[in-house]
């Protein structure tokens, strides 16, 4: 993801109305223990780079570095993120923003000591134009009373049982949340931004592939959850009503390549979107009489204006660019352009940890568990 971020900076000329332009001045990775190709990719493509470090302390000591993007395995989140904040750097971190709830709380405590710093978490899917349209509808309460919300992130990267193990399949590096920690913030972003709060959860978690090749001729145990389905009672929306909220995070989803989806059903309107067809937004607006689903083709109808014509398709790299535009815009102006054109906040990551911690307990007890933040 570091290279995805760097590539977004290289495309900054696509954003004609931004109040600031970021410059890549330093990179840090295990360059001393990796082939030179990675370091060379950065330095050859970004002549602005002044520092290529193998020790993150060296990068954080660089006075020319104002903000950092930190994408490391989950067990390093607390150490790296807190160090970045202590060094006075604005931070874009990765989900789950701490390997567990204590780690997340430590990061938030560090952030609270530095209110002058912008601290956000990566989540790009809400920047697809169709989801921005849905966000606008949520803002103006176009759905009316919320009846039901279904959302999820499904892919098949672990469908092959012979795929070698990596850190995301090892609990000591990924954490007990498993697929929830890796994928869940993507699923929670829109509901949490909408103000919809889970009151309780009944979780069904699945460990499907129990061991994988270790890359050394043997087998290694997989102790993380492959798939998770969370059934929640949530409250929010017009009138603060209670409604069912179902969230799915799956690494083993046959037939799915990398599918993020959102479905909202309301008394006045309903909407459906899936990245399986990233152009299509399905809408049902009901004012009495017959019901009719519309299919709208979305183009470059983005939160942050681009030079690309409005009729052309939007893709994953465009979502990454829009997410970084949101971060830079907020850093430069001190505010979000609009509620759903903003990155995940530390407080929203805390809500996700409350949900996932309760989900682990729910699965262990095979019971509905009340969410801590629900009181």
What are these regions (language model features)?
Residues 1, 295-313, 326-330, 361-375:
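Terminal low-complexity tails and localization/encapsulation signals of metabolic enzymes
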């Amino acid at each position: 993801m570091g290279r995805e971020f760097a590539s977004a900076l290289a495309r900054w000329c696509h954003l004609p109305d931004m109040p600031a332009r970021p410059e890549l001045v330093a990179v840090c990775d295990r360059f001393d223990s990796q082939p030179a190709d990675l370091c060379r990719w950065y330095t050859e493509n970004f002549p602005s780079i002044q520092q290529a470090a193998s020790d993150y302390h060296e990068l954080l000591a660089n006075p020319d570095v104002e903000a950092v993007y930190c994408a490391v395995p989950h067990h390093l989140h607390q150490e790296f993120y807190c160090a970045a904040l202590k060094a006075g750097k604005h931070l874009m971190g990765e989900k789950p923003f701490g390997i567990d709830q204590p780690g997340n709380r430590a990061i938030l405590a560090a952030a609270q000591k530095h209110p002058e710093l912008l601290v956000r978490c990566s989540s790009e899917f809400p920047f697809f134009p169709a989801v921005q349209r849905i966000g606008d509808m949520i803002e103006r309460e176009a759905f009316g009373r919320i009846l039901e919300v279904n959302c999820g992130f499904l892919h098949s990267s672990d469908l092959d049982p012979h795929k070698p193990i990596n850190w995301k399949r090892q609990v000591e590096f990924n954490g007990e949340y498993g697929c929830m920690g890796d994928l869940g913030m993507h699923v929670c972003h829109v509901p949490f931004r909408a103000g919809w709060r889970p009151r309780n959860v009944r979780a069904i978690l699945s460990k499907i592939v129990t061991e994988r090749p270790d890359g050394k001729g043997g087998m290694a145990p997989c102790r993380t959850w492959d798939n998770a389905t969370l059934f929640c009672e949530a409250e929010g929306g017009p009138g603060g009503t209670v409604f069912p909220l179902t969230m799915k995070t799956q690494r083993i989803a046959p037939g799915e390549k990398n599918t993020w989806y959102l479905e909202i059903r309301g008394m006045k309107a309903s909407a459906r979107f899936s990245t399986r067809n990233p152009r299509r937004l399905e809408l049902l607006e009901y004012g009495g009489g017959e019901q009719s689903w519309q299919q709208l083709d979305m183009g470059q109808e983005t939160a942050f204006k681009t030079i690309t014509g409005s009729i052309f398709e939007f893709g994953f790299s465009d979502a990454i660019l829009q997410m970084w535009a949101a971060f830079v815009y907020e850093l430069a102006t001190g505010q979000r352009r609009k509620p759903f054109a903003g990155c995940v906040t530390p407080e929203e990551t805390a809500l996700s940890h409350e949900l996932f911690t309760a989900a682990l307990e729910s699965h262990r007890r095979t019971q509905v568990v009340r969410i801590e933040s629900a009181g």
